[in-house]
From Swiss-Prot:
Its EC number is 2.7.11.24. Dually phosphorylated on Thr-180 and Tyr-182 by MAP2K3/MKK3, MAP2K4/MKK4, MAP2K6/MKK6 and MAP2K7/MKK7, which activates the enzyme. Dephosphorylated by dual specificity phosphatase DUSP1. This is Mitogen-activated protein kinase 13. Activated by phosphorylation on threonine and tyrosine by dual specificity kinases, MAP2K3/MKK3, MAP2K6/MKK6, MAP2K4/MKK4 and MAP2K7/MKK7. Activation by ultraviolet radiation, hyperosmotic shock, anisomycin or by TNF-alpha is mediated by MAP2K3/MKK3. Inhibited by dual specificity phosphatase DUSP1. Its cofactor is Mg(2+). Serine/threonine kinase which acts as an essential component of the MAP kinase signal transduction pathway. MAPK13 is one of the four p38 MAPKs which play an important role in the cascades of cellular responses evoked by extracellular stimuli such as pro-inflammatory cytokines or physical stress leading to direct activation of transcription factors such as ELK1 and ATF2. Accordingly, p38 MAPKs phosphorylate a broad range of proteins and it has been estimated that they may have approximately 200 to 300 substrates each. MAPK13 is one of the less studied p38 MAPK isoforms. Gene3D superfamilies: Phosphorylase Kinase, domain 1, Transferase(Phosphotransferase) domain 1. The active site is at 150 (proton acceptor). Interacts with MAPK8IP2. CDD domains: STKc_p38delta. The TXY motif contains the threonine and tyrosine residues whose phosphorylation activates the MAP kinases. One of its GO terms (cellular component) is cytoplasm. The gene is MAPK13.
Amino acid sequence: MSLIRKKGFYKQDVNKTAWELPKTYVSPTHVGSGAYGSVCSAIDKRSGEKVAIKKLSRPFQSEIFAKRAYRELLLLKHMQHENVIGLLDVFTPASSLRNFYDFYLVMPFMQTDLQKIMGMEFSEEKIQYLVYQMLKGLKYIHSAGVVHRDLKPGNLAVNEDCELKILDFGLARHADAEMTGYVVTRWYRAPEVILSWMHYNQTVDIWSVGCIMAEMLTGKTLFKGKDYLDQLTQILKVTGVPGTEFVQKLNDKAAKSYIQSLPQTPRKDFTQLFPRASPQAADLLEKMLELDVDKRLTAAQALTHPFFEPFRDPEEETEAQQPFDDSLEHEKLTVDEWKQHIYKEIVNFSPIARKDSRRRSGMKL
């Protein structure tokens, strides 16, 4: 392989895996590995900044892997918002399409994620600032026509200045596409996803934000279901068992008859459920943890809630300049065809200066 490596690249083992990097990225250090790839940190010699580099594992193993890799590349490239992870660079050591087997994605480096710091006690001010950033990121993602669908503490990256970026679009889909299969870790998953009981839209992500915010307030997972039914039971204990108006909207007959078989119960009082929460925090949670998707807040609506008044800057609540183009999403292409599309994207990639907010909260984790 060394004979066909591009000039200006060097090879190094990172966590027992061979990485081939441009000489501009030095000191690669293993950060973590997942099902679809591994991540290391490195220093970009040009800027002196620390970056995260992701090497996808076997991106061309099958059509499904190749399509997933293509979608991840395109989504990262499309997202240009300070609260959404975006692409700084993409490269391959291959000198031509013929020897193209691997590629690497370069993103901003974030020190930790919300999952790792969930044990700490969050002040209301910190919760305001972090949840505000989640919603700004979601407003932007949703305006591009994309639903994240896998929002959980583990894919909300934060740095020591409490700046947050939404990560991991591995399972994100275009809002109009048919939504199927295993998506969000069950505990953060909206009830309409768990049961496919009614149409669903971008507010599935708002339900997840509600679950995450509740966990930040109490230090405990809000709905820790052992299985689907237990998850629903725990949700209904908090939201109450809905009445006829809601049941009429359900598409699923089994879900309909199950809900009708339960005694109707009112919603819990959120100020009692979350004694640490201010009245405004409890009110926002109530509006995000709404069973009926037609009544649940959108990201744009949630941002206008008085809870965020201390940090709100409408100029930072931007939308995507254009919708995400997933015209190849439904194409049945071969691995070689996906490979060609990815290679073309890499060759034609030109980095965009990413505008992060210069406004600092002065807050530390």
